Amino acid sequence: MILANAFCLFFFLDETLRSLASPSSPQGSELHGWRPQVDCVRANELCAAESNCSSRYRTLRQCLAGRDRNTMLANKECQAALEVLQESPLYDCRCKRGMKKELQCLQIYWSIHLGLTEGEEFYEASPYEPVTSRLSDIFRLASIFSGTGADPVVSAKSNHCLDAAKACNLNDNCKKLRSSYISICNREISPTERCNRRKCHKALRQFFDRVPSEYTYRMLFCSCQDQACAERRRQTILPSCSYEDKEKPNCLDLRSLCRTDHLCRSRLADFHANCRASYRTITSCPADNYQACLGSYAGMIGFDMTPNYVDSNPTGIVVSPWCNCRGSGNMEEECEKFLKDFTENPCLRNAIQAFGNGTDVNMSPKGPTFSATQAPRVEKTPSLPDDLSDSTSLGTSVITTCTSIQEQGLKANNSKELSMCFTELTTNISPGSKKVIKLYSGSCRARLSTALTALPLLMVTLAQ
């Protein structure tokens, strides 16, 4: 009898601890309707193989052609087609940037999603698959050129943007595609037309889509301590052809123009998805992923919405498309909001700063946070050729990178760049780390308390 009672007690405690330690099971709503995600080209092939899906897809495309959302939803045949497609792989399909049939994939995506929202959304969902890589992956790939272990004084005085151009020239693919876009974007057509902008944009897209990020990022996001370096960074995309124009259009007009093209629309939506400032994360970036934001920014270069640095200020990071909000009328607030997603975006600013510093969220040391003050503006100077050294003329007293601050042990002031520098260094989180279930937290604590309260009663019962 005693052995039987002891066995019951042991079984009770074992089951109680198992229930506390095991993670909760997925909710039924999460399991319902789950299906593996495929790219839209493959999803279209799967749909075409099914007569019901194929016919409904054709119907929906006819419904979306030339009709607004309310008219489409009022049609029962259109509603039925939409309901069928919502259960097909087409509805959840996504695309990969730079994939072989990217344009076809995006056309399929927008053929379904373009007319399903009421009016024009400010932020559209990205048609691209989520980015899972991190900046630390880029750093590992670029370590051969990073100068790790070099003399700190030499590193502080070097022009990182010049070093990036030299590194590109050591790679055949990077050198070839860079030379191509430089040649095309610098080719004057006539006295009134300084270049063929369409061809320049195409050459830039090929460069940023086909050259690995460890080269392109170093040229776009190199850290600078002087004006010459910052001007070289600004000149990376040959802005006189690819970026600037005679007049600045209204930003909302530029956005509307961009959204008439499936590729431009997709890259803009992806930028908003990955760089939209989030105040629920430590870095101000969605999912604390700097790499996703920088990739989305680079992905817009070579389109109507091409962004660039607005000046050659080495201490301030301000980027913008070539537009303003003049003539916005009653849409001025929306226009300013759109423009500030570039000019005053803490996620984008922190991501660029982090890359220049060689830091990522899961490899950043902890540090204090400083209030920001406006950095002084510096006049532009002409860019320099790759073989000409334009090392810093400001000396080591002007330090804008986190690593330089830590290495030299200087006292921090309240400058804007230091605020940005330390903002992203306030965490040691690894986003990829697994969850740890704490036995004495939350509901587990309450459940354990209940179990322990019931234990004496059970022992009395078993002893009888």
Swiss-Prot record:
Disulfide bonds: 40-93, 47-53, 63-78, 95-105, 161-222, 168-174, 185-200, 195-241, 224-229, 251-323, 258-264, 275-293, 285-347, 325-335
Signal peptide range: 1-21
Record key words, sorted: Cell membrane, Disulfide bond, Glycoprotein, GPI-anchor, Lipoprotein, Membrane, Receptor, Signal
Region called Disordered, residue ranges: 363-392
Low complexity composition bias: residue spans: 381-392
InterPro entries: GDNF/GAS1, GDNF_alpha, GDNF_rcpt, GDNF_rcpt_a2, Glial_neurotroph_fac_rcpt_a1/2
Subcellular location: Cell membrane
Gene3D superfamilies, per the entry: GDNF binding domain (1.10.220.110)
Membrane topology (UniProt): Lipid-anchor; GPI-anchor
SUPFAM superfamilies in UniProt: GDNF receptor-like
Proregion residues excised on maturation: 444-464
Lipid addition sites, GPI-anchor amidated serine: 443
Molecular function (Gene Ontology), one example: heparan sulfate binding
Glycan attachment residues as annotated in the record: 52, 357, 413
SMART domains named among the record's database cross-references: GDNF
Assigned GO CC terms: plasma membrane; side of membrane
Family, similarity comment: Belongs to the GDNFR family.
PANTHER family: GDNF FAMILY RECEPTOR ALPHA-2, GDNF RECEPTOR ALPHA
Function: Receptor for neurturin (NRTN), a growth factor that supports the survival of sympathetic neurons. NRTN-binding leads to autophosphorylation and activation of the RET receptor. Also able to mediate GDNF signaling through the RET tyrosine kinase receptor.
Complex and partners: Interacts with NRTN ligand and RET: forms a 2:2:2 ternary complex composed of NRTN ligand, GFRA2 and RET receptor. Also forms a 4:4:4 tetrameric complex composed of 4 copies of NRTN ligand, GFRA2 and RET receptor, which prevents endocytosis of RET. Interacts with SORL1.
Protein name as it appears in the record: GDNF family receptor alpha-2
